């Protein structure tokens, strides 16, 4: 969870997993969802293996495959400036959507449109032109 400074809202479990502090969930990732939905998602979140954040990538698919990225401009979990930088670095086609971290839930039509554009652009060929 990145913002101006790293968030302390990620809580570790004794067995190596992390989850978002339920009292901070809505403010961190779900400000644009109805409160009842944010509360439900907070209560039903599944912990993630902390090791997943340290696992090295062995292949950078963006080097030879078309890449598309969505910057959630109101994201409180992943700083939008960092998201833009990563997407630009990879040569991704960037779409900005005014939404928080759970953009695929709060703005499903906009996200689907980006996916459809990406699918049409490769036309069955998912390799970048050389």
Annotate each predicted stretch with a short phrase.
Residues 1-22, 27, 49, 78, ...:
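Flexible "cap/lid" loop of the alpha/beta hydrolase fold
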Residues 21, 32-36:
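PEST-like low-complexity, intrinsically disordered acidic/proline/serine-rich tracts
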Residues 26-31, 72:
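Second-shell loop/turn segments in exported
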Residues 40-61:
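Active-site nucleophile elbow and catalytic-triad environment of alpha/beta-hydrolase enzymes
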Residues 62-67, 89-92:
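Short, proline-enriched alpha-helix->beta-strand connector loops that line the catalytic pocket
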Residues 66-75:
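Conserved strand-to-loop "acid loop" that flanks and positions the catalytic carboxylate
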Residues 80-93:
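Active-site-adjacent alpha-helix of alpha/beta-hydrolase-fold enzymes
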Residues 92-130:
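Catalytic active-site module of serine/aspartate enzymes centered on a nucleophile-bearing elbow/loop
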């Amino acid at each position: 969870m990145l913002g101006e400074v790293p968030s302390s809202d990620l809580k570790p479990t004794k067995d190596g997993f992390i989850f978002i502090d339920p009292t901070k969930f809505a403010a961190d990732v779900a400000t644009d969802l109805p409160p009842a939905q944010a509360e439900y998602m907070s209560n039903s979140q599944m912990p993630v293996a902390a090791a997943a954040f340290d696992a090295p990538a062995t292949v950078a698919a963006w080097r030879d495959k078309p890449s598309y990225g969505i910057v959630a401009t109101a994201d409180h979990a992943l700083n939008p400036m960092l998201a833009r930088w990563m997407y630009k670095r990879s040569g991704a086609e960037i779409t900005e959507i005014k939404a928080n971290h759970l953009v695929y839930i709060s703005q499903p039509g906009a996200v689907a449109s980006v996916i459809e554009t990406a699918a049409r652009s490769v036309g069955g060929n998912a390799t970048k032109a050389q």
